């Protein structure tokens, strides 16, 4: 299993984890009867929560992006002289930003999904929604940038990848945050149950002094 070293600072990871917990967990008060089947609870906590459809889309997106980048670069070179100066600056800036964010996005997506790390996967979702999606929508919807047929085709396919990854990562985050919350509740419940058991043992067995309170008869 590869080891992923996250570039996210620790304070930002904590913030992303808190935001993910507040957004993706259904904060309902749980009754104590919810924990009556401990075997099923432990089995659910041990279940792998990595999202296979998300991993497949990340895999194919990683191979598709170089083709998208080369196509966009060639189309930009063809139409560059026909564009106003401000559109030239916008398109070049958009290409640079989308390339940088794509590398970071793929890394966070792989690390978050394979290693089941909520902050990394939340960072992947936020970058996809706040940066990649607006830039790509600008590339595909503004008619003044002279959208060529090849551009429209590769942008549409890239947009399909992006929307699918957004939905899949949202579902994966819900599963991971619920699993973490379930593990937390199980640890708390197990700790309280252990304390109650330890307090009850001296009443029926050996007290703290090591002497039995029950009468012992010679055989």
Swiss-Prot record:
Main location: membrane
Residues the record marks as carrying a glycan: 18, 27
Keyword Transferase: no
Source domain of life: Eukaryota
Pfam families named in the record: Transmemb_17 (PF09799)
Membrane topology annotation: Multi-pass membrane protein
Family membership noted in the UniProt record: Belongs to the TMEM17 family.
Function: Transmembrane component of the tectonic-like complex, a complex localized at the transition zone of primary cilia and acting as a barrier that prevents diffusion of transmembrane proteins between the cilia and plasma membranes. Required for ciliogenesis and sonic hedgehog/SHH signaling.
Record-given protein name: Transmembrane protein 17A
């Amino acid at each position: 299993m590869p080891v992923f070293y996250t570039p996210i600072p620790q304070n930002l990871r904590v913030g992303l984890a808190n935001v993910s917990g507040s957004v993706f967990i259904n904060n309902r008060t749980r009754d104590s009867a919810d924990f009556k089947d401990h075997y099923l609870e432990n089995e659910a906590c041990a279940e792998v929560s990595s999202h296979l459809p998300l991993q497949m889309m990340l895999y194919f997106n990683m191979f598709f992006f170089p083709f998208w980048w080369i196509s966009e670069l060639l189309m930009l070179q063809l139409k560059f002289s026909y564009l106003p100066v401000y559109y030239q600056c916008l398109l070049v800036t958009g290409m640079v930003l989308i390339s940088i964010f794509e590398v970071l996005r793929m890394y966070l997506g792989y690390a978050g999904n394979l290693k089941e790390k909520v902050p990394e996967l939340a960072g992947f979702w936020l970058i996809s929604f706040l940066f990649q999606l607006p830039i790509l929508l600008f590339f595909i919807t503004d008619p003044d940038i002279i959208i060529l047929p090849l551009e429209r085709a590769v942008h549409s396919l890239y947009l399909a990848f992006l929307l699918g990854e957004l939905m899949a990562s949202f579902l994966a985050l819900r599963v991971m945050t619920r699993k973490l919350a379930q593990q937390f509740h199980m640890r708390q419940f197990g700790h309280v149950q252990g304390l109650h058991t330890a307090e009850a043992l001296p009443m029926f067995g050996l007290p703290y002094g090591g002497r039995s309170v029950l009468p012992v008869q010679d055989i």
